[in-house]
UniProtKB/Swiss-Prot annotation:
This is Fructose-bisphosphate aldolase. Belongs to the class I fructose-bisphosphate aldolase family. SUPFAM superfamilies: Aldolase. The lineage of its organism: Eukaryota, Metazoa, Spiralia, Lophotrochozoa, Platyhelminthes. NCBIfam families: FrucBisAld_I.
């Protein structure tokens, strides 16, 4: 009797592989529009806008009804549960609108971080209970990929072995459950930029974390060709006094991936991690221009770095919708170019060089 069991049928593997590859098609990346109700409330507070369901719906409509040209640069959108079931003011479901434009709808399925006992202020992520049923429902409702975020912190004692092991296994369990239900899992082990650590420390920790993740994915029989990785770019801590160039960041990031990420993985979609819009775009561009071996597509899955200027231009006012859409489209184009190593010049956006860092950031 063979000890190897086919955990997914050939048809399901083909669908997962094709959708994962479509997400990282050349010149395209993801819009992360999966902020929780609480998190988007903080963004709205900055423009003195009340955090109501209608305002959240109107803002997401602004993004999704931008000139269809945005679909040349955005392959998919990560949605929050509420958004999956919202509609345009004309009554068209957002999921249907996105699919008509050739944009894959995705869904955030984790339920947030919780303290991890036996550690020094570390955490794990909850949401595995009834995940299979939720994934099946989201697939039926039109979603084709999912995202799950785990968080690790750098300090004199962290990340601990326990935190790396626990979060890697949580990500792997999530990934397998997603694949069983037809969703491409985006695996997000975020090493937070909080702290004063240097670039070398950030690289070493990122390599450790990714090593744990890919060991766990193998242990859980996850089909790598039907997954994507969403890691942090390797940068020094926010409070580090030493300055590094985008080329330094690119080298550290690519080396970390080379040492840990199997070539079977079709793509890496970086989170922006509180960088300014300009810094995130420049770093992505430098990563793609770096001359080392890069067997994966290297693209973006940005939230704040694709939206900050759009919100600032919109201000919650209907007459500013076109201005907000213009900002979003400009950022989508810039990052599409950066994912090919072809971004040049500056970003002339409302929040271009403004840091978007939030300490101990939670979605």
């Amino acid at each position: 009797m063979s000890r190897f069991v086919p955990y997914l049928c050939a048809e399901k593997m083909k669908e997962l592989r094709e959708n994962a590859s479509a997400i990282v098609a050349p010149g395209k990346g993801l819009l992360a529009a999966d902020e929780s109700t609480n998190t988007i409330g903080k963004r709205f507070a900055a423009i003195n806008l009340e955090n109501t369901e209608e305002n959240r719906r109107a803002y997401r409509e602004l993004l999704f009804t931008t000139d269809p040209e945005f679909a040349k640069h955005i392959s998919g959108v990560i949605l929050f549960h509420e958004t999956v079931y919202q509609k345009t003011k004309d009554g068209k479901p957002f999921v249907e609108l996105l699919r008509e434009r050739g944009v894959l709808p995705g869904i955030k399925v984790d339920l947030g971080v919780v303290p991890l006992g036996g550690t020094a202020d570390e955490c794990t992520t909850q949401g595995l209970d009834n995940l299979a049923q939720r994934c099946a429902q989201y697939y039926n409702d039109g979603c084709r990929f999912a995202k799950w975020r785990c968080v690790l912190k750098i300090s004199s004692h962290n990340p601990s072995y326990l935190a790396m092991l626990e979060n890697a296994n949580v990500l792997a369990r999530y990934a397998f459950i997603c694949q069983q239900n037809g969703l491409v899992p985006i695996v997000e082990p975020e090493v937070l930029p909080d702290g004063d650590h240097d670039l070398e420390t950030a690289q070493r920790v990122t390599e450790q974390v990714l090593s744990f993740v890919y060991k766990a994915l193998a242990d859980h029989h996850v089909y790598l060709e039907g997954t994507l990785l969403k890691p942090n770019m390797v940068t020094c801590g926010q409070s580090c006094t030493k300055k590094y160039s985008v080329e330094d960041n690119a080298r550290a990031t690519v080396e970390a991936l080379q040492r840990t990420v199997p070539v079977a993985v079709p793509g890496v979609v970086f989170l922006s991690g509180g960088q300014s819009e300009l810094d995130a775009t420049r770093n992505l561009n430098a990563i793609n221009k770096y001359p080392g071996k890069k067997p994966w597509a290297l693209s973006f899955s940005f939230g704040r770095a694709l939206q900050a200027s759009a919100i600032a231009a919109w201000q919650g006012k209907p007459e500013n919708v076109k201005a907000g859409q213009a900002e979003f489209l400009q950022l989508a184009k810039a990052n599409g170019a950066a994912s090919l190593g072809k971004f040049e010049g500056e970003l002339k956006t409302a929040a271009g060089q403004k840091s978007l860092f939030v300490a101990n950031h939670a979605y």
